[in-house]
Amino acid sequence: MPGKMKTMDGNTAAAYVSYAFTDVTAIYPITPSTPMAESVDEWAAQGKKNLFGQTVKIMEMQSESGAAGAIHGALQAGALATTYTASQGLLLMTPNMYKIAGELLPAVFHVSARALATNSLNIFGDHQDSYAVRHTGCAMLAESSVQQVMDLAAVAHLTAIKGRIPFINFFDGFRTSHEIQKIEVLDYEDLAHLLDRDAVARFRQNALHPDHPVVRGTAQNPDIYFQEREASNKFYMALPEMVESYMAKISALTGREYHLFNYYGAPDAGRMIIAMGSVCETIQETVDYLNARGEKVGVLTVHLYRPFSLKHFFKYIPKSVSNIAVLDRTKEPGSLAEPLYLDVKSAFYNSDWRPVIVGGRYALGGKDILPSHIISIFDNLAAERPRDGFTVGINDDVTFTSLPLSDRDIDTSSSGTTACKFWGLGSDGTVGANKSAIKIIGDKTDMYAQAYFAYDSKKSGGVTMSHLRFGHNPIRSPYLIDKADFISCSQQSYVNKYHLLAGLKPGGTFLLNCSWDVAELDEKLPVAMKRYIAANDIQFYIVNAVGIAQKLGLGGRFNMIMQSAFFKLADIIPLTRAVEYLKQSIEHAYGNKGQKIVDMNNLAVDSGIESVVKISVPQAWKHLEDKVVSPKKLPAFIKDILIPMNRQEGDSLPVSIFDGIEDGTFPSGTSAYEKRGVAINVPVWQTDKCTQCNQCAFICPHAAIRPVLISEEERQNAPAGFSAKRASGTEDAWYRLAVSPLDCSGCGNCADVCPVKGKALSMQPLESQEHEIELWEYALSLTPKANPQNKFTVKGSQFEQPLLEFSGACGGCGETPYAKLVTQLFGDRMMIANATGCSSIWGASAPSIPYTTNHKGQGPTWANSLFEDNAEFGLGMLLGVDAIRDTLATQVKAALDNAPDVPLDAELSACLSDWLANKDQGEGTRERAEKVGDTSGFANAREKSRTPTVSMPHRDYLANGSHWIFGGDGWAYDIGFGGLDHVLASGKDVNVLVFDTEVYSNTGGQSSKSTPAAAIAQFACKKTRKKDLGMMAMSYGYVYVAQIAMGADKNQTLRAIAEAEAYPGPSLIIAYAACINHGLRIGMGCSQREARRAVEAGYWANYRYHPELKEAGKNPFILDSEEPEEDFQAFLAGEVRYSSLKKLYPEFAEFLFKKTEDDARERLEGYKKLASS
């Protein structure tokens, strides 16, 4: 019988099925698998029952390795156990997977398959991770669509239990895991009928228990190990028939036909593609298109990849097939070919059938694969000598592996399908609104629906594109929309940056959010856009969603205005019903944030419908001619890579563009060329009110506001409007607070922290400040001035150039101000090892690199290894540098010792002696290095080769580097804690900066061991106290430790950073960082104020532990925080992560709130005792 139809994504489908068969799950967040664990956690908290009448027991672990170990233990104890992971997380589970398979335990690993980090990190889908564990002994089952995930995930669980073999159930990350489809949901009652209860009983009876004790995991010798390994063969031999049997039962239940290998296409096909994953849906769609035009082609979809059953493989391939292409979504450098291709060739080697077989790679790292690419593959198979070892979807103009793109103009989508594309900005709500819209269409109508959301890695402020399809036929199009019926754009600045209307069909609809009135459109819209609108009879509408949102008090969240306008224009369902459904979705999405938020969004829906304006398109637009613009002279990287990528044209870049940077090396300072212009309002300097305190620049997350010192001559030559005032503290300079409107995120923290009554900064609309762009560029062009202040003061630090600028961090980010400050103090000699996480994403999302250089070309050098090994990676960087500097010191010492025999220039000798005596000192190291390099004696010695004083390869190491290890609390408190502890214990001179947001910010806000009790994170509510990382580090006695909160005490922040860097040993700085995941009721524009509130309420304490004070006979612990004066519970109520607990779990909210306060008070009392001892 047909089941209930529901709109959901692949992750939800996998979670739904897995919940039914799971007693215990151990989890760890990693993109894109995290939503599976979140759903299971949410259902468990709601009391949802599995097939055994129990709620699932869920435990968040410190790493994926820990999660695999925990489910291994649960399985041995007789509990059915499941976990969810991807990419590097899956690799961390590998050792346990061998054990679980070897011990014949029925685990299921649900994997949203994702690229592995190689020359770069990539969070998007391919099969590198899944292929990497094919040798573990786990069975492997692959799905191609959301519906298949629902159906076949059940097969994985059922067969694992019956067959005693663990399963890796995998599907494409993002493309399937996050694609929303209307699917049929399996009923738990039907699944219960399929479950082999006797097999469950046997499994439980075989569990470890002291009532029937056995020993497992012995150490075996060569005499028996081999034999016992071979003894498990029978389980693998029996498994394919079991899988086929359960697939037959699912097929009978659903009417959808499943086999280990599913063939689709012409029964007498001559050409066939073999593949697995979402590409099979695209191939099926293309097969229908080609066969309808007289060709004879087909596709074999692989479901059960391990064990690979030859019997079932040959059963479904038409005997007419003569040419086969095998597609692998992975790359194995140095191998003869990729895995599935080798398996297929091996299969045919064992038969009498000898078709032509070629293989190719496709869609690595989430690359889109289109029907036109599939046609290229079929065209290749039709060639007299089909190309082998090909790639598709790229232009490989270096090793020439790529197939030429088919020039056919095709549309393979189902007839009657409507395609809509929505351009948005990360954090503007466009994606969330479209998720609501597609669920309304899918759940409230009889139409099929599909949604997919494409976005970059920026934390917010990046481009998002929502792709929605709906129609009366099933949708098999797992690729981005290239021909749209409707296009919406939520950002007016995009009209000059992107080809917004590319692919909009003639007669299609275009909705633009803009503040321009009808008269201004002719001036503001680019010529090419106007011409396209007129020439293609585009129905053009505008709405001032930003203005409406601000009037309603919604700030930059205008998503519901745009969404209601969409429903009005798209005419999918009656408008009154659409409004009703939208308001229901608002209640569901924002209900826990308070009725006021709900009411404002309801008004936004009504306003969006009422405010849409249809534009009468002038016919003259058809004949407009493009203006000739002289191109700017730009660095090759910017011109050839950054600009095309930022125009969303990176897919078309050829392989040759990356010649010379194959190892993943990117130049510094590229973010300065982006000029994103994403702010709604930007700060405007009120010259007469400013006291020149520089606090606004100090806390700016994006370095978009800076104090500039100007000479009289520079002031006289300045452009009009370049106001300045006499600089305080110096007699011969003028002062200006420069603002970059196009680099500002518009958070407003600068205005919030301004101490002047009436404020020296006011937030004004971005478009009103276009004149500031030229003034900013002039300010940056001025000659750098010597700092007239002490750089270790708040004011003085801001006269140092920030070497972290214009990152993709969220507006109001609490992390970047700390990192930026460190670069201002030590950036010219910094080496940074950065853990994967938020700070690695805002720190190095290609092509935007915010770490930059000074006028001498010096700046932070930055690298990322992995999430789990960052401390060790940073230590390794230090050890490598130390080894080279030791060689350098040996050379210098030898030169000085040989001075009587080989006389040195007196100046050089003095400089070398000074350098050798102070080589490990940070302050003054640049000056000492430059003195050595600048002496005439050094030049002469090098020229005459009289001594190996400083060999050229080592000269860069004269200056002592400042070694920093950056990471978030998920790294420092959890997955990387073991390594961090070891590095701190080593006594080596490294500086660790932990951005403590108290959640896993990068994966969506899950709890870490830094999360206090009562905080609602994605994995439900935290019930245990916050780990005191600082106290743990202090126990060594020789680690410098500080807790800081910039918004509470800027001077203490500066002092701690300066002391930590100067300390000749390990240092740990734990920095409180407000985050969008906290849900600040005062908004992220007040994130610095929130840090102050945290300290004033006693939620957070600022302190420093300085081991050198102990050596001087003083107390090494200094508590910098004052006695709390603010209400602790009021502070908690000001953040949604706490306040929502009352709405969700009122029965124990007060208890946990009190526990959180008691924990904080106890922690603070402990600090007080340390400070007074």
From Swiss-Prot:
Binds 3 [4Fe-4S] clusters per subunit. Residues 922-946 are annotated as: Disordered. [4Fe-4S] cluster 2 binds at C700, C744, C747, C750. Its EC number is 1.2.7.-. InterPro entries: 4Fe4S_Fe-S-bd, 4Fe4S_Fe_S_CS, PFOR_II, Pyruvate:ferred/Flavod_OxRd, Pyrv-flavodox_OxR_EKR_sf, Pyrv-flavodox_OxRtase_EKR, Pyrv/ketoisovalerate_OxRed_cat, Pyrv_Fd/Flavodoxin_OxRdtase_N. It comes from the Bacteria. GO terms for molecular function: 4 iron, 4 sulfur cluster binding; iron ion binding; pyruvate-flavodoxin oxidoreductase activity; thiamine pyrophosphate binding. [4Fe-4S] cluster 3 binds at C810, C813, C838, C1075. GO terms for biological process: electron transport chain; nitrogen fixation; response to oxidative stress; small molecule metabolic process. Its cofactor is [4Fe-4S] cluster. Residues 681-710, 735-766 form the 4Fe-4S ferredoxin-type domain. It holds the Pfam family EKR. It catalyses: oxidized [flavodoxin] + pyruvate + CoA + 2 H(+) = reduced [flavodoxin] + acetyl-CoA + CO2. [4Fe-4S] cluster 1 binds at C690, C693, C696, C754. Residues 922-933 have a biased composition (Basic and acidic residues). Keywords: 4Fe-4S, Electron transport, Iron, Iron-sulfur, Metal-binding, Nitrogen fixation, Oxidoreductase, Plasmid, Repeat, Transport. Oxidoreductase required for the transfer of electrons from pyruvate to flavodoxin, which reduces nitrogenase. Belongs to the pyruvate:ferredoxin/flavodoxin oxidoreductase family. NCBIfam families: pyruv_ox_red. This is Pyruvate-flavodoxin oxidoreductase. It comes from Enterobacter agglomerans (Erwinia herbicola). The lineage of its organism: Bacteria, Pseudomonadati, Pseudomonadota, Gammaproteobacteria, Enterobacterales. The gene is nifJ.
